[in-house]
Amino acid sequence: MKRFDPRSLWRPVVWICRFRHRRGYGVHSPFAFQLITRVFYERGEFYAYRPLAVVRRTEACGQSERLDRLMLRLVNDVQPRRVVLWGDAVGVTRRYVEAGCRRARIDEVGCGALPAAKGYDMLYARRPADGLALFEAFAAQAPDRAVAVFEGIHRSRRRAAEWKAVCSHPRATVTFDLYDLGIVFLHPKLNSQHYLVNF
């Protein structure tokens, strides 16, 4: 039986406030529009959804199936070579990342510091205590076209302030605020833009 989460009562209010930011309306960048329509809002049945649903029933899950499926689609679109998973209880999310890109090397670092000079293409951070410091450590060693994903960016005022600081970082060019997740692209050739998405 699922535990009741009081934040679920707030979810309809958030959805109504973000209603005009759905499905890519008003987005003019081809890169951002493609990502919103073909990754965030993809409704097709991916090849790995059914086997991963079986795994999900047997293992402890850290986040919702909806967010894990989004991670699979994002990894499938980005195709990173090296991924680092930061935080506790990322086991099921790791399976989704592996299914999205089988050739990616995946490291789990728990809640410790990121290994220096590893050249990670993608960072997934589950509710980091200091998101800005973690992003700065990632951005210092990340190659161009890297991606950082932060979970729980609106869980508290402190995390929301950290998310704003991450968005204003010089290497963060395109950011997406999906309320539950924050996605940062480090693409130097793209114009700096911050998108609010009703996901």
Predicted regions and their residues:
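A short alpha-helical cap/connector motif
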Residues: 1-144, 154-199
